[in-house]
C-alpha cells in the first residue's frame, strides 16, 4: 500500500520544489543574498509543506478501512 502512495508523494514534492523555485523568497528580514544552499532549500520546502498542509490533507489522510 505504501508503494502506491510513493508516486503521489514524489509528485507533491516535485510541485512544491517547482513552486519554491518560481516564488520569491519571502521573509520579514532583509536578505543580502538569495538562498541557494541545499539546507536553505530544504527549510523552504519544509515551510511550504507546513503552511500548505490543509491543501495536501486529502492526499495524506489514511483510508477508511471500516469493518
Swiss-Prot record:
Keywords of the record: Amyloid, Cleavage on pair of basic residues, Disulfide bond, Hormone, Secreted, Signal
GO molecular function, one term: receptor ligand activity
Location (main, coarse): secreted
Name this protein carries in UniProt: Islet amyloid polypeptide
Species name: Oryctolagus cuniculus (Rabbit)
Subunit structure: Can form homodimers. Interacts with IDE and INS. Interaction with INS inhibits homodimerization and fibril formation.
GO BP of this protein: amylin receptor signaling pathway
Family stated for the protein in its record: Belongs to the calcitonin family.
Cystine bridges: 35-40
Domain of life according to the entry: Eukaryota
Subcellular location: Secreted
InterPro entries: Calcitonin-like (IPR021117), Calcitonin/adrenomedullin (IPR021116), Calcitonin_peptide-like (IPR001693), IAPP (IPR000443)
Amino acid at each position: 500500500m505504501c508503494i502506491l502512495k510513493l508516486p503521489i508523494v514524489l509528485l507533491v514534492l516535485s510541485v512544491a520544489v517547482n513552486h519554491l523555485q518560481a516564488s520569491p523568497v519571502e521573509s520579514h528580514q532583509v536578505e543580502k543574498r538569495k538562498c541557494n544552499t541545499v539546507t536553505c532549500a530544504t527549510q523552504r520546502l519544509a515551510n511550504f509543506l507546513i503552511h500548505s498542509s490543509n491543501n495536501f490533507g486529502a492526499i495524506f489522510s489514511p483510508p477508511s478501512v471500516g469493518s
